[in-house]
């Protein structure tokens, strides 16, 4: 196998046994693909499909005027280039967006003839549309945001029941609901009396037949739709009915049923079963005489006209009187509805009988009254309202997804129409749709069919960025449409252009609102690469059109069988959002309809193929899916007699030939974060949940350290997160320094006519959203060959292209003097000295100079009443130097604000006129370092309002940026010239000269001669061969063009920098100062492993006091062994043992290198590690000796191992590795007390565990209040660090003081220290005067209590006096 640039340097031994059928997909595709399809930017306007933006425009245009004489048509849209790139937008605090222009055609028709009179086409500016960065984020107002995908109920039709909770009888009431993508909901529901009702948009309920009447059906038609008819014959005074034996099955015989000979087949009162049915069929019975009573309560199926013209209406209940009328009226035959109590209920007929509306108009009026209560109904209004509810494509859209789900649920065939017309037709409801839903509901009530499970992932779909932006865009366009319609009638007369008609503000506002303040547009979690990736792969059930925390029940939050391979069962927040916010599984993706799919291998006749098929939860129904680790022989046949499979949501065992699919990978079930936990299969799920969540809070350490025990997913996460620099094309490293890499691209990857230079500028010490530090470090060397996709530089928390969130620590599981009580962690001072858990945090402090009523604020070093020492770190412009070390209270930016003019005496005026004394009328409002902060200034940015003169500092910053850019361009041109020179020498070599340059006519051009000449001289040579001369001219022209292009780029950059910045109104200048703070680990900081084993650092011990082994090697960290059994996360122990083996092997390799063993011996030892102890085999023979030495050098700190989730290392393999590393197979070591040198009683588990430092640092939490703000109502101090609040002295603390009888302390707590307003001012004064005397008064909360009681109507007064 071929190794990449970084893999060669450090191969991770993989214990996985299962073959890799497919690589993990690109992890951000759900975001990137969704937005790409929405914009369709790369496609030409002619080839754009009807999706995304195109669909939004198509659905609103054409817009016609009310008279129909003018119309606006949409032709195409185009996106311009964004003004600034992503980094510039983040610095300037602007939005990364592209201007959108839309070509609109205005058509004006002649009023009389309706022929086209005039056509005008014009491009209209429609505002800016935010662009997605290549890593799936948006930059909105300078901050990176993520749009989280939403998991919502799919449009379609759903059948459900209330589980007997609505009615006191406990009767199960069924209901059906049609949910469109946009428009009114239509619900049908049964009540306890078995009548069917309808609700529109959850309004007051109506009888369902009202809607059927409104659709234009009469009684007979309605009965016809829902029931079969049963003919009744009146013959010689007795009634006969057609006998269909199958229909009678299950009914109770109300009379003896006899055959033609009079032999009884079924006795009265017996239930008719299958045997009786067979006997009746054998007897050949076709008619059955029935007594009159049998027909009582039956229902007439149609109107029956008697002799005398009297009509017995359809849906009449037969009774003795009606039967007599029928007999007298000479009716020989009539139809009744076939109903019974078992599976043919008379629900619709009963509802129809209860319905008081007689015709369509009455029904429409009834619906109008419900929808618009209080408005007087007119015939037209009622008609329009009903039509607009479900039958107008403007107001109602089921969407292709909804139509697919609808037809599928009702068992109809489904083909989706792609063109706009068929989309509109399929988007609205038809009469048949409504009838079919009602019919299905009645059948479910009759006991046929099942209700739906709304938590099934076939009934929930994912709405991603693209779709949500499209919806917002449509909302904006609809607002535009309303305004345009008003103006179009003017356009007919006033000769307006499209530009005059369209006001794009509503569109821009809708988009801005969505990206800026929607619940699903979130501030990106940028703690580390993993937290970024997880945030982008999150699916939330909350948000607009979704659930709310309070309403969501237990079922919605629970793990459902369809989550398998689609949504992670582990990773979800603890707390009120549990189960509502989920994470996509590693291999999951959303299909075109938005349903989540997961890949499976196809299995044919018990043989597993390599064909991979993505199945959604809907398609998975009925399949039989084997586990990824099912036993398979070398030909791919399943070998077990019964294979463990998943079928219909159950785990069962089936023979191999029944199996249809097989899992692709063992990691398929879990999300990215969970798949990074080694030995996840040995951890309790609750702890694994904490582990996945805490990995996202890990702070990038100063030097990233790859995990010794990983899972093999680390490289994928680092690569896909976008924090590393990845080579776009292969080539040779031409130049490299700390902040840039220049690559000369391979010839075969170059596009004709380009320089073949790729320049990568690295991000250095930049602030992330969470104030952690983003910094990239080069890992390539000059002259190295790299291929496309290789990692060139590591980002934060990555090491050689692998995710590295923490540090490998030598841990011992033992108690140590109570310092690890309750999960506390005891650390060694060595960790501190080596800066292993030190992180850099960057704070942004900004100073804004505004234009005030009294004059402009000024940024200056001339500050009144400030000593020389305080200004020592500022330059002439009053801005701090880069590199200055500042502490709390230091001035960063000097700023003065004008004060109100005071009345001056004439003498003062004179003095001021003479000496120009101006200091008195300004006050110091400088930006100072906040309390509790100290650090180094690493960057300063100055933004000046357009039209104001820039100060020296701003100009210096601008110059530095230009110089850096010029350097890039020069580098590019230099490589370009070198490439051209090589090409020219290749062309001229061996040719004959025609003179020119330093050659004479007839000279043979040798390589020695040519290689001594510069490019300019080479291009002057005129070769005899004209074809070559032509090529030389081309190269010359090309170089000129390139030079001009580079000059133009530089000029453009200069123009960008020279223009002022767009600042908010009233702001003249903004100075941003970036402070870097180094945070070492200290007691009170929170740390954790990857298995949910979290704790707080309790103490940092000197190295000499730490427990050590017989060789004197001390441990780094002491953990409490009692934290393991009750929490059931045994994975950490296995990780510790395997980590010990990895480190031991590294030590052995280091020893071999020190002893300068031969490469052959090294090869043999590496072969033992990689290929003898199980797992994936590595091809070490493909590496050269130099590469083997480099590899061994990188393995000295430990051999990195991968134990994939659910397919990891076995106990025996861990023991074998320990043995190979010359460590006891038990993994336990005898330790000695560092203080006394005594041996501890029994061997201790010592090994290497990967420990993370979490972003819960004691520095951010330490807080003390002196005097601060108070709550308005209760007058008590506020709570929390952000409000500068006090410590709450709660109910239980009061009990404690009461128990101690500390009366005065208690009085002080409840009065002057809290809410006794007068008392606290008095005591403050007393303390200032040095008189420590307390005079408590009435607490404000007592007054609040009395007011509260009075508000209940009880008068309460406090009597003062005796």
Curated annotation (Swiss-Prot):
GO biological process: DNA-templated transcription
Enzyme Commission numbers on file: 2.7.7.6
Assembly information from the UniProt record: The RNAP catalytic core consists of 2 alpha, 1 beta, 1 beta' and 1 omega subunit. When a sigma factor is associated with the core the holoenzyme is formed, which can initiate transcription.
Disulfide-bonded cysteines: none
InterPro entries in the cross-refs: DNA-dir_RNA_pol_bsu_ext_1_sf, DNA-dir_RNA_pol_bsu_external_1, DNA-dir_RNA_pol_su2, DNA-dir_RNAP_su2_dom, DNA-dir_RNAP_su2_hyb_sf, RNA_pol_bsu_bac, RNA_pol_bsu_CS, RNA_pol_bsu_protrusion
Keywords (A to Z) from UniProt: DNA-directed RNA polymerase, Nucleotidyltransferase, Transcription, Transferase
Family the UniProt entry places it in: Belongs to the RNA polymerase beta chain family.
SUPFAM superfamilies attached to this UniProt entry: beta and beta-prime subunits of DNA dependent RNA-polymerase
Organism in which the protein naturally occurs: Acinetobacter baumannii (strain SDF)
GO molecular function, one term: ribonucleoside binding
Protein name, per record: DNA-directed RNA polymerase subunit beta
Catalyzed reactions: RNA(n) + a ribonucleoside 5'-triphosphate = RNA(n+1) + diphosphate
Enzyme class: transferase
Function: DNA-dependent RNA polymerase catalyzes the transcription of DNA into RNA using the four ribonucleoside triphosphates as substrates.
Recorded GO CC terms: DNA-directed RNA polymerase complex
HAMAP family: RNApol_bact_RpoB
Entry keyword GTP-binding: no
